Amino acid sequence: MDKRIFGIETEFGISYSSPDSRPLAPEEVARYLFRKVVSWGRSSNVFLTNGSRLYLDVGSHPEYATAECDDLGQLIAHDRAGELILDDLVDEAQERLAAEGFNGTVYLFKNNTDSAGNSYGSHENYLIPRRGEFSRLAEILIPFLVTRQLIAGAGKILKTPHGATFAFSQRADHIWEGVSSATTRSRPIINTRDEPHADAEFYRRLHVIVGDSNMSETTALMKVGTVDLILRMIEAGVIMRDMRMENPIRSIREISHDLSGRALIRLANGRQLTALEIQREYLNKVTSFVAENGAHNQHVPLILDLWERTLTAIESGDTSTIDTEIDWAIKKKLMDSYRKRHGLGLDAPRIAQLDLTYHDISRTRGLYYLLQSRGAVRRVVDDTAVKDAVDAPPQTTRAKLRGDFVRRAQELGRDYTVDWVHLKLNDRAHQTILCKDPFRNVDERVDALLDSMG
C-alpha cells in the first residue's frame, strides 16, 4: 500500500495523591476526570472534533484513540494532542476536587504498568489489504515485534528476587500469547479480531498490542514506521528468512531483561539467534527494499538511520548516540546520572519515582517534558502541529468527515451518534451515513448533511 491508515490507542494510568484528605480510588478519580465529557457527551465514550475517540476503558483507565492518520508525523501530532486533551481534563478535575474539599493531586501517566503490577496498553492499528494469508503475515511480524523493544521500548526498573534491574520494555512481562482475538485476558502480541472499521471486502486492520507507550516522538516514529516498512515488503512479496521462535512469550521476557541484546533465542527450526541478529536481519531487508524501491515518505531516512544507530549502540554498550531519541536510553541516562550524583542503587525509592515521573503527561511536572523544554530530546513535530491537532481532524482521511460533523452538531446543539464508520443525526429521520473508505476525506452525502443542518 502506497498510503496506509495508522492509529494509536493509549490507555493512561491514573492516580491520586492526598496527604491531607481522604484517598480516592482510581474509579472515583476517573469519574471526576470525565465529568465534563459526560456533561456534554452524555457518555464517557465520545468522539471529538479532531476525529478521535476518548473513553474510559476497563479498570477506569482513560483511553485516547487517535483519528485515522495517513502520515507518521500527523499520527504523532494527534497522539500528542491526546495528552493535551487529557491534561486539560486533569486541571478541571483538580478544580472540582478542590471545590469539594479534596486537596490532593491527580496524576495521569503514559506508561504501561502500575505499582500493583497491573498492565495497560498502547495499541497500534495498521490498515492492510484483505488479500493474502493473515497467518503468514503474523508469522513474519512476530519475531520482529518480540525484538522491537530494542528500538522502541520505554524502559523500566524491574524488581526481581535478585534485586532491581533495568529492562527494555514495560509491556514484555505482561504478554501471554502470540496471536489471539482477546486483548485483556490473554494479552497477545497481535490481536486477530477482524474489525477493519473499513470495507471488509478490501481491507483488514492489523491490531498490534505488544508495544510500550512512548513519550519520545522519535521512538514512536520508530515503533510505527518500522512496522509500516516491513508491511510494505510483505505486500510486495519479498521473501523473508524463517525466524519463527520456539517460544515467543518466553523470548520476549528474556530479551527485555538483557540489555546486551545477545541472549540466544531458540527458533522453531532449532537454530539460535540473538535479538540483535534478528533485528539486523529485518533492518538489512528493509534497507535493501528501500534502496530498490525508494523511500515512500520523508520519514524513512530518519527511521533507517536511527534503527541502525540504536542496534549499534546496544552492540557497543555506548548509548550516548541515541539518548535523546530512544525512550529507554533517555530514561536510563536520566537514572544513571541521578544515581551517580546521589549514590543510589536501582532499587532506591527515588529512582522508582523517577521511573514513574518520566511518564507524567503534565507539561509542568513530567520529567520527559522537562527534558523537552530544555531541548534535551529530539522532536518529530512542533508544538503548533500538536495544538492544531487538539481541535482539527486530519484533513486527508475519513476523520475530516467525522470531525466536521461532530463540530457542526455541537455548535448547533443537535443530538447525534457517531462511530468510526457511521454518522447520524438523531433528531431527524435522516438515514445513517456509512463511511467505509478511511482514505476518503470528501463525501457529497456528508456535505449535504452539514448544509441541511444550517
Curated annotation (Swiss-Prot):
ATP binds at R53, T66, W420. The gene is pafA. This is Pup--protein ligase. Pathway: Protein degradation; proteasomal Pup-dependent pathway; Protein modification; protein pupylation. It comes from Arthrobacter sp. (strain FB24). The reaction mechanism probably proceeds via the activation of Pup by phosphorylation of its C-terminal glutamate, which is then subject to nucleophilic attack by the substrate lysine, resulting in an isopeptide bond and the release of phosphate as a good leaving group. Catalyzes the covalent attachment of the prokaryotic ubiquitin-like protein modifier Pup to the proteasomal substrate proteins, thereby targeting them for proteasomal degradation. This tagging system is termed pupylation. The ligation reaction involves the side-chain carboxylate of the C-terminal glutamate of Pup and the side-chain amino group of a substrate lysine. The keyword Ligase applies. It catalyses: ATP + [prokaryotic ubiquitin-like protein]-L-glutamate + [protein]-L-lysine = ADP + phosphate + N(6)-([prokaryotic ubiquitin-like protein]-gamma-L-glutamyl)-[protein]-L-lysine. Its EC number is 6.3.1.19. It is an enzyme of class 6 (ligase). Pfam families: Pup_ligase. One of its GO terms (biological process) is proteasomal protein catabolic process. GO terms for molecular function: ATP binding; ligase activity, forming carbon-nitrogen bonds; magnesium ion binding; ubiquitin-like protein transferase activity. It comes from the Bacteria. The keyword Repeat does not apply. Belongs to the Pup ligase/Pup deamidase family. Pup-conjugating enzyme subfamily. InterPro entries: Pup_ligase (IPR022279), Pup_ligase/deamidase (IPR004347). Mg(2+) binds at E9, Y55, E63. The active site is at D57 (proton acceptor).
